[in-house]
Amino acid sequence: IERVNGAMGWLPPPSEGIPGVVVIGTEAIRRGFDPVCLQQAQRVAAAPGVTDVVLNPDAHAGYGAPIGCVLASPTHIYPGPVGVDMKCSMSLLQLDLPGEALRDQQVRRELIHAIAERTPTGAGKGQRSVRKGRPVGVRLGFKAVTQGITAEVCRSLGVPLEWAARCEDASHTGHDGTRQALERRLDDLLETGRFPEYDGKIEQLGSYGGGNHFGEASVVEVVSDDEARRTARHFGLVDGGIAFMSHCGSRGFGYHLATNQFKTLQHWFAREDLPLPGGEKQLVYAPLGTPQADDYLDDL
């Protein structure tokens, strides 16, 4: 990795016509990258349609492409870099509790108990696993994943509608910009038996699995800086207040969709005798505009 400056490096392309890889991180971080991670980054850069690749400081070897890398591909979809934990993301909820409230042991215990009563955790766990879990169910789950946070879905889940305004993907549409495409796709998967154990998987929405999923209550501290205060106001954060940070994904529901896409595209590559980028079967892709790409976009 060549040095660009104190916080950035450059992994030169192995040959002409292939983009190099931007590496974000101090010199110590850049020295710590696994050789397999760097090889995967260069392999991804040489794949069809890829125009840019960036390695973040936490990048490590993944499914054909490094986990923690960012790639731009305007014409091709790559399931490998996306991964299999769909909607794996962070959310932050500002509570109306002041920070000093948690100094009281009883309040701490009540907060922990309230969270545990409502939040299923662990492999295979779903909404029926906790006493006060939100009953997702088959019909409501279908609407949630094909419509997003509509007024009807919010009412059914007991979620304030105004929360939808702060959600980055409050509404869902398919490859053609319609909800109907999503409904047709999910109906097709169910009717053809390509979504086994759907009922149990849909009930896992709104829960934590194993791995690195977590929920964490913290005290918000806004530093004495105008930009920091503006940012806090934008996100509705209260200095000295308690906020709940959550990291989770779509559990078994999203995992099935993602792994099924891997298998479908790998079968398509084998049937059509298409060359794998770098010989790596995890780097199968779908050119935009093809039925394979449309199905992937609808699934995800």
Go through the PLM ranges and name each one:
Residues 71, 234-235:
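Conserved ATP phosphate-binding architecture of protein kinases
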